[in-house]
UniProtKB/Swiss-Prot annotation:
Protein name: Calcium-dependent protein kinase 7
PROSITE patterns referenced in this protein's UniProt entry, alphabetically: EF_HAND_1, EF_HAND_2, PROTEIN_KINASE_ATP, PROTEIN_KINASE_DOM, PROTEIN_KINASE_ST
Superkingdom classification of source: Eukaryota
Chief location category: membrane
Further comment found in the protein's record: Plants over-expressing CPK7 show increased recovery rates after cold stress.
Region described as Autoinhibitory domain: 343-373
Transmembrane segments: none
Induction comment: By gibberellin. Induced by cold stress. Down-regulated by brassinosteroid, abscisic acid (ABA), and drought or cold stresses.
InterPro entries for the chain: CDPK_Ser/Thr_kinases (IPR050205), EF-hand-dom_pair (IPR011992), EF_Hand_1_Ca_BS (IPR018247), EF_hand_dom (IPR002048), Kinase-like_dom_sf (IPR011009), Prot_kinase_dom (IPR000719), Protein_kinase_ATP_BS (IPR017441), Ser/Thr_kinase_AS (IPR008271)
Length: 542
């Protein structure tokens, strides 16, 4: 499911941009299908999918498919669709302008007539779920809205006007080692973040990284999660996906895991330093043979002038044995990256874990509000957190025990003391530390960008302020605690923690200040007087 912004095609289309003597232009189109052609045992039904026309001849209407499983607003009521930015195998990307703000975005439109199989529909759903799951990371293209009508699914996302990283490589031939180290640190940081959140990209290549600003090589955004999947630690995948130059050998052997993303990143690093891929041939079959053979050329120019440390990192990222290959967080600690001044000691993107820690310091009102917000989110927005819960809930009971949480954190690369895990258990389960239920886990791990959305904040406030007075009182909070089976002790203290003007109740501005303030500690900052408005002055929920 290719994506596109300015200055080139992104995603599934490949335009043979490497120098001719070093490259082969494999068949334009979806690289996912190209890889299937390599596999002689691939089921015939998948190689020869029925066309939309053949479906229509059988009396079926592909436009009747409900991809999102819910009704959405009309895209054109909120956005003006502009010029075409590019064309992919499954969708077309357009420039669009939000009517209310005048802000420009990219809108990827996927016609339903191209969603021929159940797997095609699931691929689109999963792509949207993963984009929501990863939203908020500064180096991942932000998803803004998703719409569906009778003809298509429309994904509105951040507009990246700087073009492709691939184009920058082509323009410069190869980067200095310092620049390459800076770029690969960002790319591998994205990979490490994805893996820590239980996502495997499966199609890493320069074309799938965009620049927000054409003058800033470091303004990188990862795009195109059409082949990405959720995974659990130790899970083995067998589906042949990816792009020939960047595919790992274990993918061709149909037995792989997230280590394959590190291989692809290693190929990107080789390209960043030399301008050509390490494995190439005059045919697609030849490329695969070269990948399986695994010989890396460090003799041709410019490699004699490149440091041994850089070559050491490439060798360790392109180790043929996945278990011996560096993990993403280990790449970030390699001496070559450290020597270039952009190293990090971060072994795991802490987004989910830090939210769990913050949750342990949160008052009951904020916890309740997060539960309300979590219940309002669509399935695709919480799908990633659901998969993480399932990975920890090994017995499929819908609850997590102390031991399961400790083991799950360890498998995701996080080390906590038993006392810290106990604090998390106690906080997330409100009043005891025996188990964490699914709903409590979702509320505790909501990303900040979900919490701070105006419509979610207003809906949560309205949940407490059922009579519409514009204030949350002790009585209202007591009723809410009862509805969620939470202990209602210390409610007056909870009110006083949030009540900034000491009138014994919480207005909308104070509620927003609590939700948007620091989650650690309860000393909320006083809001500016311009924000000190009651609910009656806040935007209305539609």
């Amino acid at each position: 499911m290719g994506n596109q912004c300015q200055n080139g095609t992104l995603g599934s289309d490949y335009h043979n941009r490497f120098p001719r003597e070093h490259a082969v232009g494999y068949v334009q189109g979806d690289s996912y299908l190209d890889l299937k052609k390599f596999d002689d045992t691939w089921p015939e039904v998948n190689n020869f999918k029925p066309t939309a026309a053949s479906i229509l001849r059988r009396g079926l209407d592909p436009t009747s498919i409900n991809v999102l499983g819910r009704k959405t607003a009309d895209l054109r009521e909120h956005y003006i669709i502009g010029r075409k930015l590019g064309q992919g195998q499954f969708g077309t990307t357009y420039l669009c302008t939000e009517i209310n703000t005048g802000c420009e975005y990219a809108c990827k439109t996927i016609p339903k007539r191209k969603l021929i199989t159940k797997e095609d529909v699931e691929d689109v759903r999963r792509e949207i779920q993963i984009m929501h799951h990863l939203s908020g990371h500064k180096n991942v293209v932000a998803i803004k809205d998703v719409y569906e009508d009778g003809q298509a699914v429309h994904i509105v996302m951040e507009l990246c006007a700087g073009g492709e990283l691939f184009d920058r490589i082509q323009e410069k031939g190869h980067y200095s080692e310092r620049k390459a180290a800076e770029l690969i640190r960002i790319i591998v940081s994205i990979v490490a973040m994805c893996h820590s959140l239980g996502v495997m990209h499966r199609d890493l290549k320069p074309e799938n990284f965009l620049l927000l600003d054409k003058d800033d090589d470091l303004s990188i955004k990862a795009i195109d999660f059409g082949l990405s999947v959720f995974f659990k630690p130790g899970q083995v995948f067998t589906e042949l996906v990816g792009s020939p130059y960047y595919v790992a050998p274990e993918v061709l052997h149909k037995r792989y895991g997230p280590e394959s993303d590190v291989w692809s990143a290693g190929v990107i690093l080789y390209v960043l330093l030399s301008g050509v891929p390490p494995f190439w041939a005059e045919t697609q079959q030849g490329i695969f043979d070269a990948v399986l053979k695994g010989h890396i050329d460090f003799q041709s120019d410019p490699w004699p002038k490149i440091s041994d440390s850089a070559k050491d990192l490439i060798r360790k990222m392109l180790s043929h044995c996945p278990s011996e290959r560096l993990k993403a967080h280990e790449v970030l600690r390699h001496p070559w990256i450290c020597e270039n001044g952009v190293a990090t000691d971060q072994a795991l993107d802490p987004s989910v874990i830090s939210r769990l820690k913050q949750f342990s310091a949160m008052n009951k009102l904020k916890k309740l509000a997060l539960r309300v917000i979590a219940e309002r989110l669509s399935e695709e927005e919480i799908a990633g957190l659901r998969e993480m819960f399932k990975a920890v809930d090994t017995k499929n009971r819908g609850v997590i025990t102390f031991g399961e949480l400790r083991e799950g954190l360890r498998r995701f690369g996080a080390e906590f003391k038993d006392t810290e895990i106990g604090d998390i258990m106690e906080a997330a389960h409100n009043d005891n530390n025996v188990t964490i239920h699914y709903e409590e886990f979702i509320a505790a791990t909501l990303p900040l960008n979900k919490i701070e959305r105006e419509e979610h904040l207003l809906a949560a406030f309205t949940y407490f302020d059922k009579d519409g007075s514009g204030y949350i009182t002790v009585d209202k909070l007591q009723r809410a605690c009862g509805e969620h089976n939470m202990e209602d002790s210390l409610l007056e203290e909870i009110i006083s923690e949030v009540d900034q003007n000491n009138d014994g109740q919480i207005d909308y501005a104070e509620f927003v200040a609590m939700m948007q303030g620091s989650n650690v500690g309860l000393g909320w900052q006083t809001m500016e007087s311009s924000l000190n408005v009651a609910l009656r002055d806040a935007p209305q929920v539609h």
